[in-house]
């Protein structure tokens, strides 16, 4: 093939055989046996091939569903501990997508039901991270909704159908992809019924939202405005079937352990009754493992809503050892992230083991779980990250326990010189 530019080697005007543009309208015209193709058509062909290859890869990965053990193994790379929750989630997600792969097969008279998931665990125990990692692993659209912003239709606040709209936005309004996605609804415990007794006042952000979510979670056809527009009667709506969308609801459920303990420690009355001490109470995580649907109803979820979430997974409180592991072991561990930031400035960052212990202790004191680790490290490293880009001679930064406690500054090691550490400023 030859490259023809501007017709200099021939007086005849040449045209692209595909788009019909002349050689003067394009940058380059490539000649073949009695045919010509321009650079624009070559780019277009490359785009088409690239899209088809990506779609084929996505389809092949969708058909190859990892086993529960493989799913749990991948979760291990990102989430520390919570083995029981990982096992429950792995089996539930595997069965859900296995059900979707089988739904189009003819002659199968057994219809498999959907098993939505309820995650119960303290703040910062890894509920959201588990859901995010699952969606990334399965290559499906994923969105997070905050239950506290939802209200019944017709009231100020977000409509429950906005959840599906967010899911559509994640996959460029591809309805087929959205119908295979995962929705994580956070803070689900905050929409619990305000009182056990029916009230004259309408509870539009509590029981009202639970009622509105019922059909969405179980399976309905939701009408969603295209491209995020507002609803009006003359508008065309996108119809999204939610039967095959996996809903994962998560919440801290503060106080649920007391409901469980009251149920499990009820004794008889009289001289023969067993006397039980209040001090014999279990840890929150241990109590939550014994949760039953009735406990959730007493907490404030309506029975119908609890019934739509048949898979229960409880997460344990993170102890000091687990928090130290979270700081160093996962693929995207915080210490690795900050080390990478310093590496971009050609500086090594070292955390001593006593520093990691001090960070874990502080996070436990704040009762924020793993979520509090980043804010602690950010505060400790703020001044250093401010100064380092201006000090090209620094080669290493060392963080020990005293730095975390605020009694000294990080140790700075300079090239071809002695290490220096400034005293911590007086409070």
UniProtKB/Swiss-Prot annotation:
Residues 4-57 form the ClpX-type ZB domain. GO terms for cellular component: HslUV protease complex. Zn(2+) binds at residues 16, 19, 38, 41. ATP binds at residues 122-129. The keyword Methyltransferase does not apply. It comes from the Bacteria. It holds the Pfam family zf-C4_ClpX. Keywords: ATP-binding, Chaperone, Metal-binding, Nucleotide-binding, Zinc. One of its GO terms (molecular function) is ATP binding. InterPro entries: AAA+_ATPase, ATP-dep_Clp_protease_ClpX, ATPase_AAA_core, Clp_ATPase_C, Clp_protease_ATP-bd_su_ClpX, ClpX_bact, P-loop_NTPase, Znf_CppX_C4. GO terms for biological process: cell division; proteolysis involved in protein catabolic process. Belongs to the ClpX chaperone family. Component of the ClpX-ClpP complex. Forms a hexameric ring that, in the presence of ATP, binds to fourteen ClpP subunits assembled into a disk-like structure with a central cavity, resembling the structure of eukaryotic proteasomes. ATP-dependent specificity component of the Clp protease. It directs the protease to specific substrates. Can perform chaperone functions in the absence of ClpP. This is ATP-dependent Clp protease ATP-binding subunit ClpX. It comes from Pseudomonas putida (strain W619). The gene is clpX.
């Amino acid at each position: 093939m030859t490259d023809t530019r501007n017709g200099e080697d021939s007086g005849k005007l040449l045209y692209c055989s595909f788009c019909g543009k002349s050689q003067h309208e394009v940058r380059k015209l490539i000649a073949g046996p009695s045919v010509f193709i321009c650079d624009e058509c070559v780019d277009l062909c490359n785009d088409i091939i690239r899209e088809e290859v990506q779609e084929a890869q996505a389809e092949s990965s969708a058909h190859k569903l990892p086993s529960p053990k493989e799913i749990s193994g991948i979760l291990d790379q990102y989430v520390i501990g919570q083995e029981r929750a990982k096992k429950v989630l792995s089996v539930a997600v595997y069965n859900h997508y296995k059900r979707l792969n089988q739904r189009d097969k003819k002659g199968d008279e057994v219809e498999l039901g959907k098993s939505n998931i309820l995650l119960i665990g303290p703040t910062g125990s890894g509920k959201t991270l588990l859901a995010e990692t699952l969606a990334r692993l399965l290559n499906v659209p994923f969105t997070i909704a905050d239950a506290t912003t939802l209200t019944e239709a017709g009231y100020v606040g977000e409509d429950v159908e906005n959840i599906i709209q967010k899911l559509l936005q994640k996959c460029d309004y591809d309805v087929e992809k959205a119908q295979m996605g995962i929705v994580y609804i956070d803070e689900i415990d905050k929409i619990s019924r305000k009182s056990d007794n029916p009230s004259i006042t309408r509870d539009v952000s509590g029981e009202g939202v639970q009622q509105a979510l019922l059909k969405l979670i179980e399976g309905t056809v939701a009408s969603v405005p295209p491209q995020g527009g507002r609803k009006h009667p003359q508008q065309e709506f996108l119809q999204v079937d939610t039967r095959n969308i996996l809903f994962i609801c998560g919440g801290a459920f503060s106080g649920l352990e007391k409901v469980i303990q009251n149920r499990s420690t009820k004794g008889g009355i009289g001289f023969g009754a067993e006397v039980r001490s209040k001090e014999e109470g279990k840890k929150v995580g241990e109590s939550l493992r014994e949760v039953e649907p009735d406990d959730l109803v007493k907490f404030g979820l309506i029975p119908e809503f609890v019934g739509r979430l048949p898979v229960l997974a409880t997460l344990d409180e993170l102890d000091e050892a687990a928090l130290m592991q979270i700081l160093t072991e996962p693929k995207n561990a915080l210490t690795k992230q900050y080390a990478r930031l310093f590496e971009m400035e050609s500086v090594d960052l070292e955390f001593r083991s006593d520093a990691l212990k001090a960070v874990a202790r502080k996070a436990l004191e704040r009762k924020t779980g793993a979520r509090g680790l980043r804010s602690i490290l950010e505060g400790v490293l703020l001044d250093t990250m401010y100064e380092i880009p201006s000090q090209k001679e620094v080669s290493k930064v060392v963080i020990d326990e005293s730095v975390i406690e605020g009694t000294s500054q990080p140790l700075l090691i300079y090239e071809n010189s002695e290490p220096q550490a400034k005293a911590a400023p007086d409070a």
